[in-house]
Amino acid sequence: MEGPAFSKPLKDKINPWGPLIILGILIRAGVSVQHDSPHQVFNVTWRVTNLMTGQTANATSLLGTMTDAFPKLYFDLCDLIGDDWDETGLGCRTPGGRKRARTFDFYVCPGHTVPTGCGGPREGYCGKWGCETTGQAYWKPSSSWDLISLKRGNTPRNQGPCYDSSVVSSGIQGATPGGRCNPLVLEFTDAGKKASWDGPKVWGLRLYRSTGIDPVTRFSLTRQVLNIGPRLPIGPNPVITGQLPPSRPVQIRLPRPPQPPPPGAASIVPETAPPSQQPGTGDRLLNLVDGAYQALNLTSPDKTQECWLCLVAGPPYYEGVAVLGTYSNHTSAPANCSVASQHKLTLSEVTGQGLCVGAVPKTHQALCNTTQKTSDGSYYLAAPAGTIWACNTGLTPCLSTTVLNLTTDYCVLVELWPKVTYHSPDYVYTQFEPGARFRREPVSLTLALLLGGLTMGGIAAGVGTGTTALVATQQFQQLQAAVHNDLKEVEKSITNLEKSLTSLSEVALQNRRGLDLLFLKEGGLCAALKEECCFYADHTGLVRDSMAKLRERLNQRQKLFESGQGWFEGLFNRSPWFTTLISTIMGPLIVLLLILLFGPCILNRLVQFVKDRISVVQALVLTQQYHQLKPIEYEP
């Protein structure tokens, strides 16, 4: 019976679609690989649905990580029962039915994991005693493995007969909106916080009655995580078109006031200004170097008298400097942490000593000047402006203490600096001097070594001390903006290259499939060539994930950068000609204001002075025309 099955040649048993099926599995696996940062904040929505009626009993949304976004859910028992139940009079259609439901105990049985003998949906997964895992009954049902616990909430003593306040008069004591007098509280257990909520979980609920059949209802609990969808390309491949030379500085012209049209002329719609052109590669590189120079010139003017600033052409292009700073605690996720992201971005070089949080291993304790342990509780640690948390799971602007307490993660507070080296003029001159002279290995000073700690030690410590602090903040923010723009353009370039590679691989796969169809009788292309089959493993999914990670981190840094600006600084960023206009008219306005303030006082002083001098002159004239008589002495 089995002989003929093994008597055929081996190539006849090769499924011609096998390579394509395996290839599709490999590609799908490569694309679906996700490297979630445990500190990433998502918009999580929990939804409790009555499966008997399809209505939503509760929908709660909050911002949090995948580890600590497990709130308490409040809803009413009548949201799960409905107007009518198995028997007449047990529903929540009337106030009496709602009040009667409050007198019964209830128990809940899980439908996501049904033990043997517990039945199915018809029995509410409570086919026998012992299947219940939670509820509110005299025997106190409980479980160590179920995902939730469901108990009754606090019912006011003056609740009354569960009247609906929207139907009856307001004078009836205890009436509530909708007649909701059976509050329930759903909490997640430790097992529920560790479980996978990729799909809905189902439970059955039954009212306990001493006689008769216990009525059944079913509900589901679903978690929905909102995330930013994929970005679809439209138009030609912009990989090469983005490589633009440095643009010439454009002279800013003040806008002219609109001229009124002549009488009888047709109205002309003004043309809109063309959109601003994106900076090219040369502009971005020059902005990085210019921002580095501005920050260095402010902090160390002696070093910028004559120097060379060189942008490193090889990776790593950025480095981190550990700093000490004061983070802020938030009970809920801040706005700059709410952008959804999927993947990790790390730093290959971190120097200095700064603030560390979590369980730092011995190999990285040299980066820590101060190590703080997080206390129990669920809150978020937001990095100060200009800094970011460098964790072993990736870069993030916020930390979740729940993740730190449950894992062995650690984070260091760092500043992000471009890899710009500083050289003295002597070093550059020696590179062009003639003659074979022995040269020492130069000591490369990077921008991180020269300006490390500027955010926390220089600018942040001097905030509010005057004009110097304001100028320092502006120079540092200029460098931050240049770094942000450069990272954004690098992300776009790599994303475009990844798309080109994916398109090329799709063409190759189509050719491979066509050849397999042509050699279908021979068992496929590999069998016809009598060679080992090679399968293409596409790792562009990981590239796409990391680029999405970088894009979202850039958005977070942009929001943090904008939130750190005051109203006065943001006023100058609204329009390109606003700064020039203000600087032009500010001087005359200040002079006019000073004249209006101090002019009357000065004029009064001047008039009084003139009057005094005139009085003195008049007195001198009178004394010259008359002389004083000598007194005559009379003899007695």
From Swiss-Prot:
Ranges spanned by the short sequence motif CXXC, renumbered to the chain: 307-310
Residue stretches in coiled coil: 472-508
Residues carrying covalently attached carbohydrate according to the record: 43, 58, 297, 329, 336, 369, 405
Ranges for region Receptor-binding domain (RBD): 32-233
Motif CX6CC per UniProt: ranges: 526-534
Key word Transmembrane helix present: yes
Lipid-modified sites (S-palmitoyl cysteine): 601
Keywords recorded for this protein, A-Z: Cleavage on pair of basic residues, Coiled coil, Disulfide bond, Fusion of virus membrane with host cell membrane, Fusion of virus membrane with host membrane, Glycoprotein, Host cell membrane, Host membrane, Host-virus interaction, Lipoprotein, Membrane, Palmitate, Signal, Transmembrane, Transmembrane helix, Viral attachment to host cell, Viral envelope protein, Viral penetration into host cytoplasm, Virion, Virus entry into host cell
Name under which the protein is recorded: Envelope glycoprotein
Quaternary structure and interacting proteins, as annotated: The mature envelope protein (Env) consists of a trimer of SU-TM heterodimers attached by a labile interchain disulfide bond.
Annotated region (Disordered), positions in chain: 254-282
CDD domains: HTLV-1-like_HR1-HR2
Physiological role: The surface protein (SU) attaches the virus to the host cell by binding to its receptor. This interaction triggers the refolding of the transmembrane protein (TM) and is thought to activate its fusogenic potential by unmasking its fusion peptide. Fusion occurs at the host cell plasma membrane. The transmembrane protein (TM) acts as a class I viral fusion protein. Under the current model, the protein has at least 3 conformational states: pre-fusion native state, pre-hairpin intermediate state, and post-fusion hairpin state. During viral and target cell membrane fusion, the coiled coil regions (heptad repeats) assume a trimer-of-hairpins structure, positioning the fusion peptide in close proximity to the C-terminal region of the ectodomain. The formation of this structure appears to drive apposition and subsequent fusion of viral and target cell membranes.
Region of interest (Fusion peptide), ranges: 443-463
Upper taxonomic lineage: Viruses, Riboviria, Pararnavirae, Artverviricota, Revtraviricetes
Signal peptide range: 1-32
Motif YXXL motif mapped to chain: 626-629
Name of the coding gene: env
GO cellular component, one term: virion membrane
